[in-house]
């Protein structure tokens, strides 16, 4: 087994550093040739996952009519386009199958189940913490343990998984 953990910095305060982190992580993982790999950590992404299975990245915006488009963040526009941001984030969060990895939580529950690992000050839930494993690995159980977050031990709920 090869296990990798990461903490992708939040884009709000780090901008292009977040994008570069995703790009570097994707490049590193695509050069690995390992039968059983696990990638886990705080990815500070995605912005939203819809019940339809559509993933909204931080490189996108949703307008009042629900139409999704590439975002242009004036704060980072000189360093990073919305397209680059979207692709970098999506390559790990959504296109992980290119790396022969599966999202452990989604492999068990699909997009019908909502569960969150972090909440904004306004109470908006986000699923920022992920475990990805090689597609040949079995997922026996997976859940977000809300107790450490609700007891204020951490601002994130850990994702617990039993893999085989």
Write out the residue ranges for each language-model feature.
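Active-site regions of metal-assisted phosphoester/phosphodiester hydrolases
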Residues: 1-164
């Amino acid at each position: 087994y090869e296990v990798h953990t990461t903490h992708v910095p939040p884009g709000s305060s780090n901008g292009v550093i977040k994008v570069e982190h995703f790009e570097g992580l994707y490049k590193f993982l695509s050069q690995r040739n390992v039968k059983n790999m696990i990638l886990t950590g705080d990815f500070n992404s995605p912005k939203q996952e819809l019940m339809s299975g559509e993933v909204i990245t931080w490189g996108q915006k949703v307008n009042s009519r629900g139409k999704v488009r590439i975002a242009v963040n004036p704060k980072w526009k000189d360093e990073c386009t919305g397209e680059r941001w979207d692709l970098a984030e999506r390559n790990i969060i959504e296109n992980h199958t290119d790396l022969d990895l599966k999202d452990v939580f989604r492999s068990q529950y699909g997009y019908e189940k909502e569960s969150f690992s972090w909440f904004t000050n306004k109470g908006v839930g986000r699923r920022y913490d992920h475990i990805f494993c090689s597609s040949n690995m079995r997922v026996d159980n997976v859940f977000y343990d809300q107790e450490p977050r609700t007891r204020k031990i951490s601002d994130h709920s850990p994702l617990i998984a039993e893999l085989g």
